[in-house]
């Protein structure tokens, strides 16, 4: 279950589409109400559609609310602004997993050097290890294409990790074997994937048939309360309703939601955005 507590991010990654929605952050009161409702649907939240939770100075209060409702949390962040003030917050009991989008550095024009970016992240990981963290830490390298720039960047990342964590990761072996993940230390992994194109109504139709995990394994709630069928509908092109005016159970019982779900079960894509989504082809 993806809940976007803010759509604010302090980077403009080339792999993210332009944000069309106004800047917004979900209020703590509304977030509390959504967590209360979501207990009937999930045990786990991902604080992400777009936006970076670490930009919020009161992130701990959101985590407190999820913990109160016995919900575990996945955090995805570029960690561009991570510093020691985040260390204790990111040891919160609600957290199940932290994903660091490491290849975000290579997808931006930075004033920071690579070491200025990566060193504070490594500092946090070592702090978490000293605290015997029980959650998973993933370094996402989602750029395993064949471009030289990405491969050279990845080589630099691996060399840094090899030195800091006594590993022996070879960039050529990674590109040759294409592993899904590599263990760095206890509950600390590299996670690999390739770039993908975000779905857009401006795209060409990919297919009118197929299936998806949207509205099955997950759905999304944007920071303004709009409910969407999946974690890639950042602009609510498929606006299923709004949690500011409707209960989640009523939104999920709507005719439109049922039509989408039944379509996926019968290999039919009813929504235009789904027909224009390349990522969905992974599930065919």
Regions found by a protein language model. Name each.
Residues 107, 126-157:
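Conserved strand-turn element in the central/C-terminal portion of the radical SAM core barrel
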Residues 221-222:
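Short, acidic, Ser/Thr-enriched surface-loop or helix-capping motifs
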Residues 124, 128-136, 166-207, 232-282:
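C-terminal accessory region of radical SAM enzymes
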Residues 1-98, 109-119:
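Conserved alpha-helical substructure of the radical SAM core
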Residues 9, 13-16, 212, 230-231, ...:
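Short cysteine clusters
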Residues 215-217:
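Short loop/turn microsegments at loop-to-beta-strand junctions
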Residues 35-39, 86-107, 155-184:
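Structural recognition of alpha->loop->beta junctions
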């Amino acid at each position: 279950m993806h809940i976007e507590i803010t759509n604010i991010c302090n980077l403009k990654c080339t792999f993210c589409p332009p944000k069309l929605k106004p800047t917004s952050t979900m209020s703590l009161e509304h977030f509390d109400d959504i967590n209360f409702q979501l207990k009937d649907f999930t045990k786990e939240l991902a604080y992400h559609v777009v936006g970076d939770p670490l930009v919020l100075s009161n992130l701990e209060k959101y985590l407190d609310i999820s913990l109160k409702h016995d919900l575990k949390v996945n955090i995805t962040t570029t960690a561009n602004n991570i510093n020691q003030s985040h260390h204790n917050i990111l040891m919160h009991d609600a957290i199940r997993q932290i994903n660091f989008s490491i290849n975000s550095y290579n997808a931006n024009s930075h004033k920071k050097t690579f070491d200025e970016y990566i060193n504070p992240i490594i500092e946090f990981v070592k702090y978490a290890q000293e605290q015997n963290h029980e959650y998973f830490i993933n370094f996402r390298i989602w750029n395993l294409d064949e471009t030289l720039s990405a491969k050279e960047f990845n080589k630099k990342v691996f060399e840094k990790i090899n030195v800091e964590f006594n590993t022996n990761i070879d960039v050529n072996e990674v590109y040759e074997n294409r592993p899904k993940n590599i263990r760095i230390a206890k509950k600390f992994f590299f996670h690999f994937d390739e770039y993908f194109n975000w779905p857009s109504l401006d795209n060409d139709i990919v297919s009118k048939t197929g299936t998806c995990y949207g509205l099955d394994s997950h759905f999304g709630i944007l920071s303004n309360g709009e409910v969407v069928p999946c974690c890639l509908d950042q602009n609510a092109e498929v606006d299923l309703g709004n949690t500011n005016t409707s209960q989640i159970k009523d939104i999920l019982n709507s005719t439109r939601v049922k039509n989408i779900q039944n379509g996926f079960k019968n290999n039919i894509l009813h929504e235009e955005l789904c027909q224009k989504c390349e990522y969905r082809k992974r599930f065919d």
